[in-house]
């Protein structure tokens, strides 16, 4: 796990966990994850799940996406989604509040790959540069994404060629995130 993205993601995950501890909540909690199996689940009460990010061993891959659309994904995209299991993590990047998307389990990884593949197929059809989403904001038509060509992290308007560069790469984006604690 010495790739800069894996290190930055692990560092942010540690900050996220510490933010939850500092507010007296212990582990992050979610009602949305109840009943889902994952190696990062600490406890499932039936009403809410407590979880913590854990290193994924062995590291996953996104070969299904690459094969499905016949494209080589940027290494940062692969490392972002394949080095740990975690629930989504709330964060702020400057004034932008977002949920950093994560892979919760192997089954969730399959679903994620299907969603990424659909996103890339739509972009190809619309003749847009390929991106892969890594975060969602409180807007139905915008996502935080990684440009597959440059590795830049961008704020992208879905279905349009409107993109604002947020960071030159994923590691520097992750290093600028501030954890946000949202109670379930």
UniProtKB/Swiss-Prot annotation:
TM region positions: none
Subcellular location, record wording: Cell inner membrane
InterPro entries tied to this protein: Syd, Syd_sf
Any one cellular-component term (Gene Ontology): cytoplasmic side of plasma membrane
Assigned protein family: Belongs to the Syd family.
Role of this protein: Interacts with the SecY protein in vivo. May bind preferentially to an uncomplexed state of SecY, thus functioning either as a chelating agent for excess SecY in the cell or as a regulatory factor that negatively controls the translocase function.
NCBIfam families: PRK04968.1 (NF003439)
Protein's name according to its UniProt entry: Protein Syd
Gene responsible for this protein: syd
């Amino acid at each position: 796990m010495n790739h800069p993205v894996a290190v930055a993601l692990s560092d942010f995950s540690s900050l996220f966990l510490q933010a939850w501890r500092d507010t007296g909540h212990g582990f992050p909690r979610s009602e949305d994850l109840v009943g889902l199996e994952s190696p990062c689940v600490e406890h499932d009460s039936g009403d809410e799940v407590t979880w913590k990010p854990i290193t994924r061993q062995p590291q996953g891959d996104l070969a299904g996406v690459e094969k499905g659309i016949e494209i080589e994904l940027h290494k940062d995209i692969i490392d972002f989604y394949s080095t740990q299991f975690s629930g989504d993590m709330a964060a702020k990047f400057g004034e932008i509040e977002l949920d950093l998307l994560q892979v919760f389990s192997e089954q969730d990884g399959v679903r994620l790959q299907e969603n990424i593949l659909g996103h890339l197929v739509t972009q190809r059809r619309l003749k847009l540069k390929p991106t892969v989403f890594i975060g969602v904001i409180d807007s139905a038509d915008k996502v935080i994404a990684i440009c597959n060509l440059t590795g830049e992290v961008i704020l992208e308007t879905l279905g349009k060629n409107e993109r604002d560069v947020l960071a030159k790469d994923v590691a520097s984006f992750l290093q600028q995130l501030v954890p946000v604690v949202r109670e379930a």
